UniProtKB/Swiss-Prot annotation:
Its EC number is 4.2.3.-. Disulfide bonds: none annotated. It is found in: Cytoplasm. Mg(2+) 2 binds at D356, D360. The keyword Lyase applies. It is an enzyme of class 4 (lyase). One of its GO terms (molecular function) is magnesium ion binding. Its cofactor is Mg(2+); Mn(2+). This is Terpenoid synthase 25. The lineage of its organism: Eukaryota, Viridiplantae, Streptophyta, Embryophyta, Tracheophyta.
């Protein structure tokens, strides 16, 4: 199994010599964290904005817009979380020798119909264990899609059709959306008889999130399903199904990361009358196994960040978010085999967040220009031209990239970091452009703003950090595809830029950052904030659809690569659903983190 490869005695020899398997007692709950306060009782921190005078090396007096970011809630607490090696190995053995082969037999049974297999695949996805059977699933769906017309010709069950639609599209088969026309009346509206089919409506709601541009029926399906499900979510009942409806309406499956979907679905499935005991136990074992896997990785990232100590060396506040950043990477690559990719992704994102905070909320324009020039040289000697505090940042970025490169070379993987270096250089171009607007109080047109604001979202950079340690396709082919600036990443970056600008609008305006998407749209079109946000939400939805379309139809890369941008979009809702949860994490996010990393599922 992959864990043996990821956590064997020869694994990660260069990453700070941190052993991944610690011979300690089994305890996944950090008592120190909650001795003085509970997750639900911690008081929120007020964030004060202020400006201070500063002089550059050229005697240029300027004002620095300083933002106080709340300190990390978690700090280095995960270093004290204990993992029992024997428990970890026992979980791995039971999964590998008992449940994997048993469920494979269920999936490949010659006695199952195509529809039964597709429903089983959907259940495996929901429970977070489909990744064990990627090849089998792709083979099953390839054959089934070839006879789609026959499969759906007489099918009038809404739940079955919606499940087929979701599963096929999730694996790159663009099942036509007109399949849902059969559920409409002559007046062109969805039949009222569907209102009583709660499971069908719920599945329709989930499937509608995989709609592509111009598929109006999927927008109609989303509105129809939500309208009729919302009254059920508000019902005071102990119904397991209604509680599940409430959870889904708060955060739909494709607005949540896969491991969180699995965590919540396992709890729901545990209370279902028709549960399959084999699948239920397998999913529980797998979640607990993954949780221990993740905590081991979090220890590495936390120790590295603590030893780097960059926050204490800088004269301003930065977002110290080692746990939250790791969570973001986990949302992109949750399968255990991507352990190294998650660690690299977390390290690079953390250090580049420092660069972002510096350019965004501290550095003068000449300093941003100097940092831009230094990164384009990509040479430690370039530090000589930087202010002292920027030398710390530049050296930290440079050495982090070099350390990862040495790690990959030690594994026989050469030239993996050039893509990352090129992306860092490109990102600095966008940061410089935004800094020029911000320091001049310039409000560009919305179109001009998005031309720079979209690539500055840097979610293609984020993805590239994970690609370093992935072997799902030829690296040369991956680089060529990435350098071609795929449409899927443009849509993803636009999606994030709009979402981010909406939730951070007041915060950015309060510190004088007038180049914000909402503000640019308001000024250009002479509309209120509410009207601007409404229009931007439409653009956000359209960008999401374009991303889904590209995921389903692109043949340039294998699914294991194309699904990563989609997964990044799923991460967004965790941090930017209602506010800036990355800059200022709230109680919901803290509790979510605890559920994923600190609370195993009872067996």
């Amino acid at each position: 199994m992959e864990a043996s490869k990821c956590f064997g005695p020869r694994t990660l020899p260069i990453i700070h010599n941190v052993p991944l398997c610690l011979k300690t007692n089994f305890s996944l709950f950090p008592c120190r964290l909650l001795q003085s306060q509970s997750l639900s009782s911690k008081k929120s921190t007020k964030h004060y904005l202020f400006r201070v005078k500063a002089e550059t090396s050229g005697d240029l007096e300027s004002t620095r817009p300083l933002t106080y970011f709340s300190p990390s809630y978690w700090g280095d607490h995960f270093l004290s979380v204990s993992i029992d090696d024997s428990e970890f190995e026992a979980l791995e053995k039971e999964i590998e020798t008992v449940f994997k082969p048993k469920v494979r037999d269920m999936l490949m049974s010659p006695h199952s119909s195509d529809k039964e297999r597709i429903r089983l695949i959907h259940l495996l996805i929901s429970l977070g264990i489909a990744y064990y059977y990627e090849n089998e699933i792709e083979e099953i769906l390839h054959k089934a899609y070839g006879k789609l017309a026959c499969l759906i010709s007489d099918e009038d069950d809404l739940e079955t059709i919606a499940i087929m639609f979701e599963v096929f599209r999730l694996y790159g088969h663009k099942m036509p959306c007109d399949v849902f026309e059969r559920f409409k009346s002559e007046d062109g509206k969805f039949k009222e008889s569907l209102v009583g089919d709660v499971r069908g409506l719920l599945q329709l709601y989930e499937a509608a999130h995989l709609g592509a541009p111009s598929e109006d029926i999927m927008d109609e399906a989303l509105s129809f399903a939500r309208y009729h499900l919302e009254p059920l979510a508000g019902t005071e009942t102990s119904s397991n199904l209604f509680k599940h409806v409430e959870n889904v309406l708060y955060r739909a499956r494709y607005h949540s990361i896969e491991i969180l979907v699995a965590r919540q679905y396992i709890s729901f499935y545990d209370q279902e009358e028709d549960q399959d005991e084999t699948l239920l136990r397998f999913s529980k074992l797998n979640f607990n196994f993954c949780q221990m896997h993740y905590v081991k990785e979090l220890k590495i990232v936390t120790r590295w960040w603590k030893e780097l100590g960059i926050a204490s060396k800088l004269p301003y506040s930065i977002r110290e978010r080692n746990v939250e950043t790791y969570l973001g990477g986990l949302g992109v690559l949750f399968e255990p085999r991507y352990s190294l990719a998650r660690i690299f992704l977390a390290k690079l994102t953390l250090i580049m967040t420092v660069v972002d905070d510096t350019c965004d909320a501290y550095a003068t324009l000449p300093e941003v220009q100097s940092l831009h020039d230094a990164f384009h040289r990509w040479d430690l000697r370039a530090m000589e031209e930087l202010p002292r505090y920027m030398r710390i940042i530049y050296q930290s970025v440079f050495e982090t990239v070099e350390d990862i490169d040495r790690e990959m070379i030690a594994r026989g993987k050469h030239g993996r970091l050039q893509l990352t270096i090129d992306e860092i250089k490109s990102l600095m171009i966008w940061y410089l452009g935004i800094a020029k607007w911000a320091r001049s109080d310039q409000v560009p047109s919305f179109e001009d703003y998005m031309e720079i604001g979209t690539p500055s979202s840097a979610l293609d950079d984020f993805a590239s950090y994970g690609f370093i340690a992935m072997d799902d396709c030829d690296q040369k082919q991956l680089k060529e595809w990435f350098y071609s600036k795929p449409k899927i990443f443009h849509a993803l970056n636009a999606l994030f830029r709009i979402r981010n600008d909406i939730v951070t609008f007041e915060q950015e305006m309060s510190r004088g950052e007038v180049a914000n998407g909402v503000n640019c749209y308001m000024k250009q079109h002479g509309v209120t904030k509410e009207a601007a946000v409404e229009e931007l939400r439409k653009m956000e939805r359209e960008s999401y659809k374009i991303m889904i379309e590209e995921f389903m139809t692109s043949k340039a890369m294998p699914r294991q690569i194309l699904v990563r941008p989609v997964n990044i979009a799923r991460v967004m809702d965790l941090f930017y659903k209602e506010a800036d949860g990355f800059g200022h994490p709230d109680q919901k996010l803290l509790q979510l983190i605890a559920s994923l990393f600190l609370h195993p599922i009872p067996l």
